[in-house]
A protein has these predicted regions:
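Phosphate/diphosphate-binding glycine-rich loops and adjacent basic-rich segments that engage nucleotide
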Residues: 1-62
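Flexible loop/turn segments at secondary-structure boundaries
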Residues: 31-32, 125-128, 161-162
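Internal helical hairpin/lid segments
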Residues: 67-138
Length: 175
């Protein structure tokens, strides 16, 4: 079996009226290729249901997964999202698409000819007081009770706080 869609990420970021931005950066696959490569190097298995071998059968063997395909997030909905990303970053911008992108790890016969699409909006383009509204939105979502009683984090929040915790200030000239 051969991949048709890439595992290209979709990303979204916005201000939150605090120092911690809202950043969602997610792959279109159940597992990213880098994690499969690490599992292969360490001789570890990958989770069941995230990849197929070259014969189209589910595998937990990292080496087999690298020779096969990664499965999309959310089943057919994820395939639809991956297709959308393929159209936006391939067809729409005039780069390779639909399984024509060369494997960056195994195919060095020429350029990949990959595409990117970036969109930016002024935060108050549609709503006058965006920062006030996003603050209310985040506050409302964080108040929702969840099954385990754990704190709800918005996308990017844990990573940002982790970076603050494990990063020490450096002299300016060292950067």
């Amino acid at each position: 079996k051969k991949s048709v869609f890439g595992t290209n990420p979709i990303c979204f970021g916005t201000q939150t009226n605090s120092k911690v931005p809202f950043i969602l950066d997610t792959s279109m696959s159940m597992i990213n290729r880098g994690k499969i490569r690490i599992a292969e190097k360490l001789g570890k298995k990958i989770p069941y249901g995230v990849a197929l071998n070259k014969f189209g059968k589910p595998t937990t063997n990292a080496k087999e997964a690298l020779a096969g395909v990664q499965l999309p997030i959310a089943g057919f909905r994820g395939s639809g999202l991956a297709w959308m990303v393929d159209i936006l970053t391939g067809v729409f911008v005039g780069s390779n698409h639909g399984g024509k992108v060369k494997d960056p790890f195994d195919d060095f016969s020429g350029p990949q000819n990959i595409g990117h699409l970036f969109l930016a909006f002024k935060d108050n383009l549609f709503v006058k007081d965006y920062k006030k509204e996003i603050k209310k939105n985040i506050k409302r979502i964080k108040k929702i009770p969840n099954l385990k009683g754990q704190k709800i984090f918005y996308p990017g929040e844990q990573k940002f706080l982790s970076c603050l915790l494990y990063t020490s200030p450096s002299p300016r000239d060292a950067i």
